Amino acid sequence: MARIELWNGDICELEVDAIVNAANTSLWMSTGVGGAIKRAGGDAIEFAAVRQAPVELGSAIVTSAGTLAARYVIHAISLDRDRRTSGGAIKAAMRSTFARARELGVISLAFPALGTGVGGFPLDEAARIMVAVTHDELPKSPTIDYLIFALRGVAAYRQFEIALSPDAEPGAPVAPEASTAPDALDSPDVSPYLAGSGAGGPA
């Protein structure tokens, strides 16, 4: 049974088989998660990605992870050329990412909150979509036994807690002062969940 965890911190620091980049169809990595991955792992990641462009919205491609601790970067094409996104694009890009992860045989995989940075997609809706797709795809992905949602800040952390909790109301407002997520962006915190245990509530 796969383990799902929330982590408040930089996805580039994670020692997993593959991290996911929220990519656009041109695959340039200048801003957001892509920019952070390129700065931490080197320009070679972007060069390898751009060689595969242009790509379709909702698809996913694989490159090495450069000097990062991860082995691969899976670029989830969740943003169009103008860096706009939609729920459908996020869902399709996630499904494509899981397909690439199965091909690679990855055991551990880390996602950012797709589309919620430069794409401006609502955090609560992104969390619900991503958690729903994850619970649908993990049973089809037998090699994956550890999945992390790598988030930055209280608001994102709380919305994914809500999406994973069987007791929380969908779309509930964020209340940072009542959240168990850490206030400091550089202070990672982990909450464990088990895929397939009801709606993904706390283990």
Describe the function of each predicted region:
Residues M1-E103:
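Glycine-/small-residue-enriched capping loops at alpha/beta junctions
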Residues R81-A203:
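Phosphate/ribose-phosphate-bearing ligand recognition and processing surfaces
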